[in-house]
């Protein structure tokens, strides 16, 4: 006679084991209709699963994230159902959920086309609209294997053979004639799976191993209702317009080419943005009392073996040989900073030492993962390492957190997700060291009143880390900043200081980056601003144009006055109509367009327009100079006249 405790604290007693769905029905017909699954004592269960003992129960509906994740997982099975009907010889591999959607890896003897995706999507909708029930059957390991052997599904058999214990009882989900295997839960009926879209096909190796067969990965998105799907697809369209690769080409910021995969060729305008970011961060380094250093690009293998990078990070390191010595190009800056710390005796009175570098790093990322500026092989980190005592950890981490929020707010990022990544399986150092490091970061977050999500096993091999992810205007998340606590690396490289009792102690090292990769951060803000950079970042801050040749000298005078004041200003004296010039520079997203006609010359003024078409009227040269200098100096996000 199970007693079921509901979220409001009320209890219901039943005479016999009862399913999640039947409990929902006992509460109300509306809840039963909305029930996708249940959370029994915190564990997700199918709506058909029986509750046999006293339990806490929450009904999962499409209104919550868990419900949406289950809908997406069931849409992956629906895709399997449809593709088996259209391509009976296809072999099914895996079909998990991902952020905003799902995918299914399939083995098919021909490449899928856009026409195939359209046909699959149509068949999925036809099947879903029959609103068939999804039937769950828990079977023995052998029965599951026999089922997939009879159906000619080698990948499912491999999963059973390699990943599932023979004593286990796998769940098979029946979608009419189609059968799939899954931990679940899944929707009880396909009426929940009407709002989806297949997005693309890509290649993917079985088990993610390049030695295995290349499969075809079909990506899809799924939502709880038509409105959510429509809004998501609209966001995707907007994201495509904002793609930093397109904007980067249109604005002539940078390019990449096959001869240097994952390496950026910065053009003048892109490099201007890069240098402005460096200048901005440098002002903050001074404000937060950092010293700036520069370490070598390449160091001997012996050093990387001492740090543990060679053993734990070797696959991502570029190496070279010279004069019978093996070197690695640095993937990160920390070992070099320890070498600088080690020069000269340090006392506890010298600590904390905050050491910053715009470090040029290289990582041998897989070619398939490279993506514009977002995933590169050569990048610059706004990196810093703080050498401190254990007593200083909390105050130093707190200062790092303050600096992170200070810098992000300048770019208009206010929605920041905080995550604490704990010890990975592959790591250096004793568990006691990791306990202290994780507790230290958690305490700093709590004392600063920050809510955070724990990411088990996602820390660096040498220490746990706080990650700061930016949520952009399209609701996408970008991981940028990190604060990592490291009790291991300084000791491995013999770093020490003289403590108050005259004993030698090993300093704690705090690794911190805020922008992260500057290349990636430029990609992020390019998409966030859609190329409409604020005036302080814009490569050209104002363009000065004449209407006829007679105004050329005045234009040059205006340009010289503004340029001499340190502003980035150009002239456009071409023999073109003024409307043509305005359209061209609007497309180039130049913040301000200054038009000089005879009336403006007579009054000693300029007519000012913004790139979004606002006519701001006329200003004297000195008035406009003061306005633009103030915007640049205070790093304002909006132009004059913008809300």
UniProtKB/Swiss-Prot annotation:
CDD domains: TGS_ThrRS, ThrRS_anticodon, ThrRS_core. Keywords: Aminoacyl-tRNA synthetase, ATP-binding, Cytoplasm, Ligase, Metal-binding, Nucleotide-binding, Protein biosynthesis, RNA-binding, tRNA-binding, Zinc. SUPFAM superfamilies: Class II aaRS ABD-related, Class II aaRS and biotin synthetases, TGS-like, ThrRS/AlaRS common domain. Its EC number is 6.1.1.3. Pfam families: HGTP_anticodon, TGS, tRNA-synt_2b, tRNA_SAD. Zn(2+) binds at residues 334, 385, 511. InterPro entries: aa-tRNA-synt_IIb, aa-tRNA-synth_II, aa-tRNA-synth_II/BPL/LPL, Anticodon-bd, Anticodon-bd_dom_sf, Beta-grasp_dom_sf, TGS, TGS-like. Residues 243-534 are annotated as: Catalytic. It is found in: Cytoplasm. One of its GO terms (cellular component) is cytosol. Residues 1-61 form the TGS domain. One of its GO terms (biological process) is threonyl-tRNA aminoacylation. Its cofactor is Zn(2+). Binds 1 zinc ion per subunit. GO terms for molecular function: ATP binding; metal ion binding; threonine-tRNA ligase activity; tRNA binding. It comes from the Bacteria. It catalyses: tRNA(Thr) + L-threonine + ATP = L-threonyl-tRNA(Thr) + AMP + diphosphate + H(+). The keyword Ribonucleoprotein does not apply. Homodimer. Belongs to the class-II aminoacyl-tRNA synthetase family. Catalyzes the attachment of threonine to tRNA(Thr) in a two-step reaction: L-threonine is first activated by ATP to form Thr-AMP and then transferred to the acceptor end of tRNA(Thr). Also edits incorrectly charged L-seryl-tRNA(Thr). This is Threonine--tRNA ligase. It comes from Pasteurella multocida (strain Pm70). The gene is thrS.
């Amino acid at each position: 006679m199970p007693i079921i405790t509901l979220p409001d604290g009320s209890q219901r007693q039943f005479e016999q084991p009862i399913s999640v769905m039947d409990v929902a029905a006992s509460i109300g017909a509306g809840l039963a209709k909305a029930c996708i699954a249940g959370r029994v004592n915190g564990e997700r269960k199918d709506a058909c699963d029986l509750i046999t003992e006293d339990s806490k129960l929450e009904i999962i509906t499409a209104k919550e994230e868990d419900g949406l994740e289950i809908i997406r997982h069931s849409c992956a099975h629906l895709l399997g159902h449809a593709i088996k009907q259209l391509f009976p010889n296809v072999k099914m591999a895996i079909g998990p959920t991902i952020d905003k959607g799902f995918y299914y890896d399939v083995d098919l003897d021909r490449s899928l086309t856009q026409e195939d995706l359209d046909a699959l999507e149509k068949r999925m909708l036809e099947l879903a609209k029959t609103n068939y029930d999804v039937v769950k059957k828990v079977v023995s390991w052998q029965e599951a294997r026999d089922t997939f052997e009879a159906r000619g599904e080698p990948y499912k058999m491999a999963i059973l053979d390699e990943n599932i214990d023979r004593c286990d009882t796998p769940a098979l989900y029946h979608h009419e004639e189609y059968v799939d295997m899954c931990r679940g839960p899944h929707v009880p009926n396909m009426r929940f799976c009407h709002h989806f879209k297949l997005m693309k096909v890509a290649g993917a190796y079985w088990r993610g191993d390049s030695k295995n067969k290349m499969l075809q990965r079909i990506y899809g998105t799924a939502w709880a209702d038509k409105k959510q799907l429509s809004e998501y697809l609209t966001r995707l369209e907007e994201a495509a317009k904002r793609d930093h690769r397109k904007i980067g080409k249109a604005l002539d910021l940078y390019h990449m080419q096959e001869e240097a995969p994952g390496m950026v060729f910065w053009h003048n305008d892109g490099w201007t943005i890069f240098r402005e970011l460096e200048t901005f961060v440098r002002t903050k380094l001074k404000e937060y009392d950092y010293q700036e250093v520069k370490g070598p690009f390449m160091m001997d293998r012996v050093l990387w073996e001492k740090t543990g990078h060679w053993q734990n990070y070797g696959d991502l390191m570029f190496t070279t040989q010279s004069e019978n010595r093996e070197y690695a190009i640095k993937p990160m800056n920390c070992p070099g900073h320890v070498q600088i710390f080690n020069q000269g005796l340090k006392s506890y009175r010298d600590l904390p030492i905050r050491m910053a570098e715009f470090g040029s790093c290289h990582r041998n990322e897989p070619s398939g993962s490279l993506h514009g500026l977002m995933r590169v092989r050569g990048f610059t980190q706004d990196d810093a390492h703080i050498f401190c005592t254990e007593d200083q950890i909390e105050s130093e981490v707190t200062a790092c957190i303050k600096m992170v929020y200070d810098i992000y707010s300048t770019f208009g990022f206010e929605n920041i997700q905080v995550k604490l990544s704990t010890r990975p399986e592959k790591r250096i150092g004793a568990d006691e060291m990791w306990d202290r490091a994780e507790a230290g970061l958690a305490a700093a977050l709590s004392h600063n009143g920050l809510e955070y999500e724990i990411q088990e096993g996602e820390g660096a091999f040498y220490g746990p880390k706080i990650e700061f992810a930016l949520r952009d205007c399209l609701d996408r998340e970008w991981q940028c900043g990190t604060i990592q606590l490291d009790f291991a690396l300084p000791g491995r490289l013999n770093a020490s200081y003289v403590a108050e009792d005259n004993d030698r102690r090993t300093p704690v090292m705090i690794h911190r980056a805020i922008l992260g990769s500057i290349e990636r951060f430029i990609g992020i803000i390019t998409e966030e601003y859609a190329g409409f950079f604020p005036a302080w970042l814009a490569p050209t801050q104002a363009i000065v144009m004449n209407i006829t040749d007679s105004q050329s000298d005045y234009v040059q005078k205006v340009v010289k006055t503004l340029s001499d004041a340190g502003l980035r200003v150009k002239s456009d004296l071409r023999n073109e109509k003024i409307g043509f010039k305005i359209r061209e520079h609007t497309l180039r997203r130049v913040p301000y367009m200054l038009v000089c006609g005879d009336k403006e010359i007579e009054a000693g003024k300029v007519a000012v327009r913004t790139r979004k078409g606002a006519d701001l009227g006329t200003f004297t040269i000195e008035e406009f100079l003061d306005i633009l200098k103030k915007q640049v100096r205070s790093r304002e996000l909006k132009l004059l006249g913008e809300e």
